[in-house]
Design a protein with these regions (language model features):
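Bacterial Sec-dependent N-terminal signal peptides
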Residues: 3-27, 206-210, 216-220, 229-246
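A short, Gly/Thr-enriched small/hydrophobic beta-strand-prone motif that recurs across taxa
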Residues: 12-15, 240-261, 356, 370-383
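Short, ordered, surface-exposed loop/turn motifs in non-cytosolic proteins
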Residues: 37, 41, 45-55, 59-61, ...
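Short, acidic Ser/Thr/Gly-rich low-complexity loop/linker segments typical of extracellular
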Residues: 276-295
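Short Pro-Gly-centered beta-turn/loop motif in secreted/extracellular proteins
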Residues: 293-304
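Zn2+-dependent metallopeptidase catalytic core
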Residues: 295, 351, 355-420
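Active-site scaffold of zinc-dependent metalloenzymes
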Residues: 410-458, 462-475
């Protein structure tokens, strides 16, 4: 596996294991299918315009207070990126957008919307809804319409639909059959008008007045104050997630199949995007149990859901073919869950099962879910060990046909260092996926996803994240030198790690051995004896000496803190490099202590050895002779 660039390892052939059968949830999204286009029908009359909503307010509540124009709550915008730089800014911003215009009947919601005149090199238009005053990234855009969007189940929204001839569709959205006339008795003389008209199942003519003087367009919480949602009792679903008592509250869970641990596990901290078919987009993030809820929304009629693999820690992209439109290289990995209807939205279970079709939707989603969980695991374990976590906001590229990886930390280093790597032959080095061929699309980290075993996908992710953590301790100049050393080693030997005689081999040895160490230790903490290799990941580490003869001491760091004196020979990872005994009489150092001396001054194993002796040895109970004997074993 690869580090700055990590070499492929010979591992046993992956095996597939069926997951246990789980109880049938109310709704499950998951299917392997080819890409299908989005098909739109007729344009609908828009009830959410400022003029229409103002008219609706004044007709309902004008006797209390009238407005010339209600304040804008949202803006419907079209993004028109003029360059890949502009699209990248949009993709990284976190704004929810789609590639089709809003306000139309949706005949079929697919994976892409055919836009005329957009060729292979072109960038389509995108559409979104921004809150009033929401900052816009550095992308060309146009405001198509100012909007007022109150909660759906309110008299104001109902009247707005009525005014544009959509009252029947409004009631269909509520699950009814539609009406066209005010029922009797329910006229404007009723104290409870218009609630008795719009919601006769709940309100009669008598009752408290509809108008709430504490909730007007001048209120700070307008328009959300128009409705107060009750917190109803909840039960737990098969995922262990709360199921809201109100079936109209969108909620559910997201899980991924773990092959080695033989079950479904929560997918943590991914974004759920919910669209009501008009101009309302809501988002939620899964918790540690994979649960999500959209508490401030009640759905009516058709709705649509996506899962976007992004959070504050990382954004995942990739899994595209060599002939794809270039802008898609920068898009966040997003899974379209499906269309919902029927009035029940509170128990949606999404499962990402092991893939069969390489490069397909299931492969992409299973890999993205597994990598995201591995990312959170690294953050937890690094905190427990007292080492730096990866930088926030990592840009991670996933590729379907590789088993290696690379941690360039592109967003964290000066462009001059990137240009040095490019001049050294980065794009011709085969260290990056073929489609990554320009400075703009180079990620912080690339991770190969050609695995059908969860622990191996987990392991390479731990390895690359260990590099990103190490980067925070050494800085950009050190990392630039590591990149040049790796490229030189590859050009001289055809191996990214080279061997002991390549220029700056010591830097490669330090960085790759540390990443390999955490790869094994952190994967073992997650999987223990449930793994796809002949023995567990910790034992595999204990039996490993170097990567190649006298180069990259993979097992060294573990021998500095374990309490085992392995009586068997440890072998170099590359077959034919040799084996030998390890004089391991050293114990007690911690990952946090070792990490503290892996800074910009530690550029080879000899310096590392000296710093263990000078900085860590006093008070440890170990001796200089034993430390020297251990290092000499490698």
């Amino acid at each position: 596996m690869l580090g700055w660039s990590c070499e492929k390892e010979a591992l046993p052939t992956p095996t597939m294991i069926e997951t246990e059968a789980s109880p049938e949830p109310s709704i499950v999204f998951r299917s392997e299918k080819d890409s299908v286009p989005t098909i739109l029908g007729a344009q609908r009359n828009n009830p959410y315009t400022v003029s229409n909503m103002t008219q609706a307010w004044n007709s309902l509540f004008g006797q209390h207070k009238t407005y010339a124009a209600l304040p804008v709550t949202h803006q419907y915008v079209k993004f028109d990126p003029q360059s890949l730089e502009e699209y990248k800014a949009l993709a990284e911003s976190g704004i929810t957008y789609v590639d089709f215009p809003l306000g139309y009947e949706v005949v079929q919601l697919g994976d892409y919307y055919p836009q005329e005149g957009v060729g292979p090199e072109g960038i389509p238009d995108f559409y979104g809804v921004l809150e009033a005053g929401e900052p816009v990234p550095a992308v060309t855009y146009q405001v198509l319409e100012d909007l007022v969007i109150p909660p759906y189940e309110t008299p104001l929204t109902a009247r707005a639909f009525e005014q544009v001839g959509g009252l029947s569709s409004y009631f269909e959205g509520l699950g009814g059959t539609g009406v066209s006339a005010i029922p009797d008795p329910c006229g404007q003389e009723c104290p409870n008008y218009p609630n008795c008209f719009y919601f006769p199942q709940h309100f009669g003519c008598s009752g408290p007045p509809t108008y709430n003087g504490d909730c007007t367009p001048d209120s700070p919480d307008w328009p959300d104050c128009l409705v107060i949602y009750d917190d109803e009792e909840e039960e737990l679903n098969d995922c262990g997630c709360p199921v809201p008592g109100d079936v109209r509250m969108p909620a559910g869970c997201i899980q991924v199949q773990d092959v080695e641990r033989n079950g479904l596990f929560p997918v943590e901290a991914v974004r759920v995007v919910w669209w009501n078919g008009w101009f309302t987009f809501k988002t939620a993030e899964t918790d540690a149990r994979g649960c999500w809820q959209i508490k401030d929304h009640r759905e009516h009629g058709k709705a649509y859901m996506w899962v976007s693999f992004r959070n504050d820690r990382a954004r995942l992209r990739g899994f595209v073919g060599n002939t794809v439109q270039v802008w898609r290289l920068l898009a966040t990995v997003t899974d379209y869950g499906g269309e919902l209807g029927g009035g029940s939205y509170n128990n949606i279970q999404t499962e990402y099962n092991l893939w069969n079709n390489q490069g397909g939707r299931d492969h992409r989603n299973w890999s993205a879910a597994t990598v995201m969980n591995a990312l959170h695991h690294f953050h937890t374990e690094s905190q427990n060990d007292g080492i730096n976590p990866p930088p926030m906001g990592l840009d991670i590229y996933l590729t379907a046909y590789r088993r290696d990886g690379i941690a360039l930390m592109t967003s964290q280093i000066p462009v001059q260092l990137l240009e040095q790597w490019i001049n050294q032959g980065l794009f011709n080095s085969q260290l990056l996926p073929n489609v990554i061929n320009s400075l703009l699309v180079i990620p912080d980290v690339a991770i190969g996803c050609n695995f059908q075993n969860s622990d191996r996908q987990w392991a390479i992710t731990q390895h690359e994240l260990a590099h990103t953590s190490h980067f925070t301790n050494v800085g950009a100049e050190y990392w630039g030198a590591l990149g040049l050393a790796t490229l030189t080693a590859f050009q001289m030997t055809s191996y990214p790690w080279g061997w002991a005689g390549v220029p700056d081999a010591g830097r490669i040895a330090i960085c790759e051995s540390w990443a390999s160490h955490l790869e094994h230790v952190y994967t073992d903490r997650a999987y223990g004896g449930n793994n796809s290799i002949p023995f567990d990941w910790q034992i595999r580490l204990e039996r490993t000496r170097n990567h190649r003869l006298n180069h990259v001491p993979i097992g060294l760091h573990f021998d500095l803190f374990d309490n085992q004196n392995d009586l068997n020979d440890a072998c170099d990872r590359v077959i034919g490099s040799g084996c030998g005994p390890i004089a391991d009489n050293v114990a007690g150092f911690t990952n946090g202590e070792l990490f503290s001396i892996l800074d910009e001054n530690t550029t080879d194993p000899d310096i590392y050895q000296a710093r263990v002796i000078n900085d860590l040895l006093p008070g440890s109970g170990n001796t200089v002779a034993d430390v020297n004997a251990l290092f000499n074993s490698y």
